Amino acid sequence: MQIRTIIILFSLTFLGCANEGNPSPSEIDLVKLISRSSITYLNRPASIIKLEIQSEDLNIIRYVEIRAIKPSTATKGALVLSTGGFGTNYYGIGLETNTTLNFAINLGLETFEIKWLGSQGWGTETAGIGYPTAVRAYGAILRYLKEKEMTNTKNIIAHGGSGGSFQIAYGLTRFNLENDINHAILIAGPPTADLNQAIFGDKALKSYWPDGIGGFRTTDYIHGWDNQGNYCQNRSQNPPDFVLKELDKSSLLSTSVTTDLNYKTNLIFINTNDETNADGQGRLYFDAIQSDKQWHYIPDETSHDVGGITAGAMKIREIIQTLL
């Protein structure tokens, strides 16, 4: 399979965007161990691993914590989990998500929950660079875990919802993440397949974001427009052409940036009849993928928190079990 990937490195200026070629993300985002501590979680021994991520081209340093739990039996692979928004929570924060963690560990999977530190998580100091570059370091974190922490790297499953799902999806479309994971379980979207449609597009389509969701301000922020135009938050106004161009570059299905849609990685999507219309955006990405994929839909549920509701969590567990 021929990979068609161009890494777009957004400059930190308000409007700037430079194409800097195609370096490996692992050479750009340098991951370093800061500390490790032992805890108990879910009545199991666990570790909190703090990592520093230095993105040299962006001149920023960010931090994550990884909550890692290993099964008591021989491992059958690894499950790497990421969360929505700016990724500032662990995956296991409630009854259903903790039940899913326990389920995976009981099956023999090591679990690694990524929690971005700072009030804006992966968005810390990234205003103005666009979504792909802002979440690019996800791949470097996963590769670090693969090289330094995972016992069994033959079956790596990446799983995330909403903003957690697009951390994975941008890795696949832009940064060759397929070389590092076997399966991806994407829930609650990903909601950024076509940002122009989501924000300024056809209101009649399920891929149009409804008013009042947090994605408008997040999108303004990550492009440098929060309190400097507020173009997405004020979408009733006609946006300047440069806004539409930047949103296209930031979309998973960009028309101006070459993206990879044919993967060695097996992709599984799980969505509800989402009140935020993340399912409509997710379906756009799903339909464009040219390799192995599955679509699972829960029409009677409207929650965006797919992993936190019983029907969504049960489907996630069902899928995980089939991947072993």
Where does each model-flagged region fall?
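Short, surface-exposed "cap/lid" segments of acyl-processing enzymes
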Residues: I69-F103
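Serine-hydrolase catalytic core
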Residues: I222-K315
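Conserved alpha/beta-hydrolase
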Residues: L101-W122
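Alpha/beta-hydrolase active-site loop
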Residues: A127-M150
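Primarily recognizes the serine-hydrolase "nucleophile elbow" in alpha/beta-hydrolase
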Residues: T153-W209
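C-terminal motif of bacterial Sec signal peptides marking the signal peptidase cleavage site
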Residues: F14-G16
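Bacterial signal peptide processing site
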Residues: A18-E20
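N-terminal cap/lid segment of alpha/beta-hydrolase-fold proteins
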Residues: E27-A74
